[in-house]
Amino acid sequence: MLQSMGDGEISISPYDTAWVALVEDDGGGRRQPQFPSSLEWISSNQLADGSWGDAGTFSIFDRILNTLACVVALRSWNIHPHKTEKGIWFMKKNMCRIDEENLEHMPIGFEVALPSLIDIAKKLGIDIPTQTRGLQEIYARREIKLKKIPRDIMHQAPTTLLHSLEGMAGLKWEKLLKLQSEDGSFLFSPASTAFALQQTRDHNCLKYLTNHIHKFNGGVPNVYPVDLFEHLWAVDRLQRLGLSRYFEPEIEECIAYVHRQWTEKGICWARNSQVEDIDDTAMGFRLLRLHGYEVSADVFRHFKSDGGEFFCFKGQSTQAVTGMYNLYRASQLMFPGENILVDAARFSANFLQLKRANNDLFDKWIITKDLPGEVGYALDVPWYASLPRVETRFYLDQYGGDDDVWIGKTLYRMPYVNNNKYLELAKLDYNNCQALHQQEWQNIQKWYRSCSLGEFGMTERSLLQTYYVAAASVFEPEKSQERLAWAKTAILMETITSHFEFQQLSRDQKRAFITEFEHDSILKYTNGGRYKRRSSLVGTLVRTLNHLSLDILLAHGRDIHQPLKNAWCKWLNSWEEGGDAELLVRTLNLMISGGGRRRRWASEELLSSNPKHEQLLKATIGVCDKLRLFQRRKVQGGNGCMNATGITTVEIESEMRELVKLVVTRSSSEDLDSEIKQNFLTIARSFYYAAYCNQGTINFHIAKVLFEKVL
């Protein structure tokens, strides 16, 4: 599916097809349609109730606009009178329902398009009821929109009105043709371009429409192409569904394609656009930055008004929830000093929080299964604290698959973005991973009991939470060794800390513990003698490192026992000073299996000599130690939760931004492998999660992520 991406897979718009069908052939002789196949499409796609529109979702805005346009097209050519009358009957019966519709779901340009169609219908003798309160409000909105962008500006510079020219009077076409897109369209709108062809007979308009009529067998979408939109949103959906690892080559190509079309002013839904929007720009910025491309945050200055507000399009009449949602998500990838993203985060968060407080999380661009849930998760669990399996588990409940429908000039579908195949695969993959995690959890409990870790102060609740954090962060089945190494390392660190602190060991006793470990061997064979099992905590530690090292030796032929032991020796000798994050990240990087396209192991010596590695290590240790301190104070104080703005301390936020920059930027051809870099951020985000979320939230996440099967 992803390999066949081109200009975009999208459903047909009866409204736009009707405008194309209205175009006359100027070849001389008798009056005839330029595109007879469009009339055939209209004739073949009337719904049973007499309307035209999206069959899966009933929106009166969508049905009225599509039906009126198709009726006008059929009456204009005096064909299919029965279908025409059936469509008129539908409108007479349902026009009053416009009063009841949610205005947030009004199609793009509806307030301009519907009045224009009504005027044409009246000239054709089509009797349409117009004296309804809802329709009068539509006319009022039309005047507001047209006044927002004065006619002189409209003819001088590209604006969103180029997308909705159809039916507008008093246009200066000699000026508008200079604003035509490279593909011959007017802002990629078939309806707007068809109207321009009617008025100008422009060859480029004709070429654009002819190409798409042929491609879509007589019909046309409400907008085309949608290449950037499709590339970006398909990747976003796959990532959030937890499926991206299956499509790495395709995703890399998608992101590279977007990067080739990127401009300093941003992008819109299609390449080579003269108009940019904040929604596509924010999604593009976020995904490009996540994949290591250099993109400047200054791009968002083009979407900020003098009053400090951010907008999607200049001259917009309403603000889209999803536009601000994606701006908020993009802002969380800020680097140090990017004040424009600080402003964007503040503005978008305030907008979304107000919408949520007013129970008003409806969007003008999409009707989706659970937009309030998506926005709520983003506000409640910021990106730094969002563990991959937690996000995916919630998104599996929020993603509507085939049922999600987009709002353009009409309702439309994007099958490469929203489809049940993604959803079915994601559910199957999640449940398979969860089953493996549950089996691992059973084995962790057996290990815990066999090692008598409870006697040293490790509780079963802490055991579960520690394994959960590892499994929610490194969830892939092929990363079982890394996941278990993380979990057992964290469990043993907590057990030893508890043993040292709560058993009130003397300094000499602690030193004896460390000395015993340092002088023992990971693999101890003396004169052919076997390693002697011991019940002590030191023995448990030695045996665990033995097993971890042996697993890697047998599976990949690498001997990691000495660097693993060295990492533990360092932690034991400085455990009071922190350093948990360093031990975890060193363990993860030693355990990298080397499988897959990107998974390349590097020796401890090679890593230690890499300046970027040392920068990452220093940054990770610094921020994780602060987060751990914050978490302990929160537990001890009982009310040390994050404040309402989601900020811990200025220092922590600043250091997280620096770490993100170190991880996602590519410094040179000698840069570290991406997975090694990601491990630093993965560990830091797990610490942030523990510090950010209260215990009740964590317990809820554990139950949902580890034990609640996706149905």
UniProtKB/Swiss-Prot annotation:
The residues the record assigns to binding Mg(2+) are 277, 279
Which GO terms of the molecular function aspect are on file?
A: ent-copalyl diphosphate synthase activity; magnesium ion binding; terpene synthase activity
CDD domains cross-referenced by the UniProt entry? Terpene_cyclase_plant_C1
Pfam families named among the record's database cross-references:
Terpene_synth
Pathway membership: Secondary metabolite biosynthesis; terpenoid biosynthesis
Q: Which family does it belong to?
A: Belongs to the terpene synthase family. Tpsc subfamily.
Q: What does this protein do?
A: Involved in the biosynthesis of ent-kaurene diterpenoids natural products such as oridonin, miltiradiene, eriocalyxin B and nezukol, known to exhibit antitumor, anti-inflammatory and antibacterial activities. Catalyzes the conversion of (2E,6E,10E)-geranylgeranyl diphosphate (GGPP) to ent-copalyl diphosphate (ent-CPP).
**What name does the UniProt record give this protein?**
Ent-copalyl diphosphate synthase 1
